[in-house]
Amino acid sequence: MEIEKTNRMNALFEFYAALLTDKQMNYIELYYADDYSLAEIAEEFGVSRQAVYDNIKRTEKILEDYEMKLHMYSDYIVRSQIFDQILERYPKDNFLQEQIEILTSIDNRE
């Protein structure tokens, strides 16, 4: 499994997990976050390896579709880059730093 895809799926899962079914959440979390194999997940849930594979592939597509429509992850990345640039350019502006900390905490709350 390639690391870029794993990182992206984990990030998309963080943003859109609440929109998934319990089964989708469990399979994706076990596969990407906990690094379970398809066989291990299948054994855990008493289903075939193919059923797990199909569910994970469908859920990956669902997560990508949510991102295409809602842009929550890509917007988060852009905001983070802008905040970093502002902090780098104005390192002594305490007010600006405080405001960025507030905005960052809003982005990072669960």
From Swiss-Prot:
Record Pfam families: UPF0122
Q: Which Gene3D superfamilies match?
A: Winged helix-like DNA-binding domain superfamily/Winged helix DNA-binding domain
Which InterPro entries does the entry mention? Answer: RNA_pol_sigma_r3/r4-like, UPF0122, UPF0122_fam_protein, WH-like_DNA-bd_sf
Superkingdom? Bacteria
Job description of the protein: Might take part in the signal recognition particle (SRP) pathway. This is inferred from the conservation of its genetic proximity to ftsY/ffh. May be a regulatory protein.
PANTHER family per UniProt: UPF0122 PROTEIN CBO2450/CLC_2298, UPF0122 PROTEIN YLXM
- State the family named in the UniProt similarity comment for this chain: Belongs to the UPF0122 family.
Q: What is this protein's record name?
A: UPF0122 protein SPD_1143
